Amino acid sequence: MRKYELMYIIRTDVEQEVVQSTVEKFQAIITNGGGEISKHDLMGKRRLAYEINKFRDGHYVLVHFNAEPAVVAELDRVMKISDEVIRHLIVKDVA
């Protein structure tokens, strides 16, 4: 398994329950694929550096996890089609 870092931004016009269910959905994809989450940080609502899809703010989430590349591909696929996610980035963690 490889180490990865995931940062994603959830829209601010959704209910808090939707934010929580979105976070749980992505955690489930990692753990159900045999991965393990080493750090999870819901950073809260923050201002974006620039406007993305007419949004100026977003709920930031940072996740450090270990998983196989197939799990990362599935996570990326689901995030691309998720309406709640404004932007996401998955990178290999070197630490």
What are the residue ranges of the model-derived segments?
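Structured, basic alpha/beta domains of bacterial-type, RNA-associated proteins
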Residues: 2-95
